[in-house]
């Protein structure tokens, strides 16, 4: 019985520390930084704990986006699917701003996946305007389907 109790305590402590390692939205994080945080997490998906990169990405998803793609278990399945799986453990990425205002920003993201194939995405973030802990935080509202660009040399 003591062993089971110790194992449960260790599991609880490790999951608490693991989740504490993830960044959370705050109003000082700029639009491009939000995308960089998400992409870096996905690039190193299991570096902190299993699927930590996906959970990091989820933390910066707009509540409206979460309603469409969630709960988190569904979001994980979506990102591991053929449609978006190239984001997981990708080799590199570039982020280029296409346009912005004080309420939204649109970016072109190009990812080189682990099979050395390039994919292009349109990625949009918006500043959250409702009261609460997310007020004035930039959050992802939309990521397009990938457009394959071909392989690298």
Ranges and model annotations:
Residues 2-10:
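Sec-dependent signal peptide recognition
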Residues 30-46, 60:
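Short, aromatic-enriched amphipathic alpha-helices that serve as compact interaction elements
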Residues 97-153:
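Exposed beta-sheet edge and beta->alpha loop/turn motif
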Residues 10-18:
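Hydrophobic h-region of N-terminal signal peptides that target proteins for export
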Residues 48-102:
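Short solvent-exposed beta->alpha transition segments
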Residues 27-32, 105:
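Charged, low-complexity intrinsically disordered segments
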Residues 18-25:
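Boundary at the C-terminal end of the N-terminal hydrophobic targeting segment
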């Amino acid at each position: 019985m003591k062993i089971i109790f110790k194992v449960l305590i260790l599991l609880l402590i490790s999951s608490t520390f693991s989740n504490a390692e993830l960044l959370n939205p705050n109003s000082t994080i700029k639009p491009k930084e939000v995308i960089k945080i998400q992409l870096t997490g996905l690039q190193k998906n299991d570096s902190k704990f299993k699927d930590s990169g996906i959970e990091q990405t989820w933390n910066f998803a707009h509540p409206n986006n979460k309603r469409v793609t969630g709960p988190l278990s569904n979001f994980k399945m979506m990102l591991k699917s053929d449609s978006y799986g190239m984001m997981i453990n990708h080799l590199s990425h570039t982020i280029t701003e296409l346009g912005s205002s004080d309420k939204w920003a649109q970016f072109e993201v190009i990812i080189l996946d682990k099979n050395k194939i390039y994919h292009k995405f349109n990625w949009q973030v918006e500043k959250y305007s409702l009261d609460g802990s997310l007020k004035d935080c930039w959050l992802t509202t939309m990521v397009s389907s990938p457009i394959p660009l071909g392989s690298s040399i």
